[in-house]
Amino acid sequence: MANSFSWKTKFKSIIIVDGELFANEYSIKLFITPYTANLKEQTEYFDRLKNLFEMVFANTITTWRDDPLYHILQKSSSNRFIELPKPPYDQIMAAVCFCKANAILDSNITVNKLELSSWQGDGITYSVDKDSKELILLDTPNWFSKKYESFDPWWLRADTATYDRELDKGIYTGHFSWNNKIPVDKKHETHAKIFEFNPKVLDGGKNKNK
């Protein structure tokens, strides 16, 4: 039987609530089981998990997709965003983090449970596992247009996207890359293709064509 362990981390993200910006910090505890016997792979995927929270999610603006201020900031700033299908309550954030963490790990490591609390969250800790009802809140029919309706929302994909955007060449797949052979490219959005992109590099990548 695989050995399980837990890991704690934090990241800061500004949240948009009712058209206002609020500083926030999320505290996360993950309960993890590795399923690959290859220690190098375990290390690579754990690095990927660490970078998801400490780099990809960090220093972002977290928002509901339909918030008017989000659309203004998209056009007038160069911030990175975490785009949610509902307003940014901690239950939604916990469910999104749980799904994205498992998506990027390719079943080599499994996050069995995730606990999340936040500075703005009144001291409440939310727990999410595969049977949690919070996951139903992420059900998003018509998230993409008909052209791209076969694609999952960003929190169910293994790329580094934290919001979704349809581009002429395909869907946006993230500011970072798991593939450590891909060079840094500051013009990431103009080069984004469907599961093929040239963004900033993170540890934990494997040589896979996605």
Q: What annotation goes with each model-predicted range?
A:
Residues 116-156:
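Short, low-complexity, polybasic intrinsically disordered segments
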